[in-house]
């Protein structure tokens, strides 16, 4: 996969991972590079939800561990990250607000394997994200690209090809473990 961003040797971009199951069976690991030099706030929000560093208002770790991919559309994208409600309606940030502003639209949705923020309109970024499975130029200037899959695109393809009903996977697609490499 061609990289839109090359990390410098001095400050390499962080790499995070998801270990995924489908219906309780292991699918494997997805590793993602976060573009901290271009989208520092967006990348840090995602990174902390991968590591569990972020705490809920009750002081408990919050993040992607044990959350599900709730929306899967073949030849488009796989969407997850709603650890609040699990259905695409929840939003949380590490910044103490339910949402944060679009950081920028420098990077484009021009290839499969891009990590981008799901939202419900301008400046409504939270915890939800999606991974593209094809180029999606119609999302440019609407969703913030902040990373890319560097390993495990085969796992993304397995998720993309799982059976769905109204774009919801028929079996749970779960992030059973996540963190930073």
UniProtKB/Swiss-Prot annotation:
Q: What are the UniProt keywords, alphabetically? A: Isomerase, Nucleus, Rotamase
| Keyword Cell membrane in annotation | no
Which Pfam families does this chain map to?
A: Pro_isomerase
What does the record give as EC number?
Answer: 5.2.1.8
This molecule's function is given as: PPIases accelerate the folding of proteins. It catalyzes the cis-trans isomerization of proline imidic peptide bonds in oligopeptides.
Q: Which reaction does it catalyse?
A: [protein]-peptidylproline (omega=180) = [protein]-peptidylproline (omega=0)
By sequence similarity, the record places it as follows: Belongs to the cyclophilin-type PPIase family. PPIase H subfamily.
Quote the protein name from its UniProt record.
Answer: Peptidyl-prolyl cis-trans isomerase H
Xref: InterPro entries: Cyclophilin-like_dom_sf, Cyclophilin-type_PPIase, Cyclophilin-type_PPIase_CS, Cyclophilin-type_PPIase_dom
Note the PROSITE patterns from the entry.
CSA_PPIASE_1, CSA_PPIASE_2
Please give the coiled-coil regions recorded for this protein: none
Asked if the keyword Endoplasmic reticulum belongs to this entry, the reply reads no
Query: Where does the PPIase cyclophilin-type domain start and stop, copy by copy?
Result: 17-180
Location of this chain's protein in the cell = Nucleus
What are the GO MF terms of this UniProt record? cyclosporin A binding; peptidyl-prolyl cis-trans isomerase activity
Per the record, its GO cellular-component terms are:
cytoplasm; nucleus
Which biological process annotations from GO are given for this protein? protein folding
Cross-referenced SUPFAM superfamilies:
Cyclophilin-like
């Amino acid at each position: 996969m061609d990289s839109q961003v090359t990390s410098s040797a001095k400050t390499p971009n962080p790499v995070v991972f998801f270990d995924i199951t489908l219906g309780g069976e292991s699918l494997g690991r997805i590793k993602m590079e976060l573009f901290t030099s271009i989208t520092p706030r967006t990348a840090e929000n995602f990174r902390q939800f991968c590591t569990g560093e972020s705490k809920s208002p009750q002081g408990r770790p919050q993040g992607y561990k044990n959350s599900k991919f709730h929306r899967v559309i073949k030849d488009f994208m796989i969407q997850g990250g709603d650890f609040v409600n699990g259905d695409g309606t929840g939003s949380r940030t590490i910044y103490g607000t339910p949402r944060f502003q679009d950081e920028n639209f420098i990077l484009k949705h021009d290839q499969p394997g891009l990590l981008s923020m799901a939202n419900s309109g301008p400046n409504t970024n939270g915890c939800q994200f999606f991974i593209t499975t094809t180029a999606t130029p119609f999302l440019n200037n609407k969703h913030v690209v902040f990373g890319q899959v560097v390993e495990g695109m085969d796992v993304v393809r397995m998720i993309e090809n799982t059976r769905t009903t109204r774009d919801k996977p028929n079996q749970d697609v779960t992030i059973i473990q996540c963190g930073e490499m």
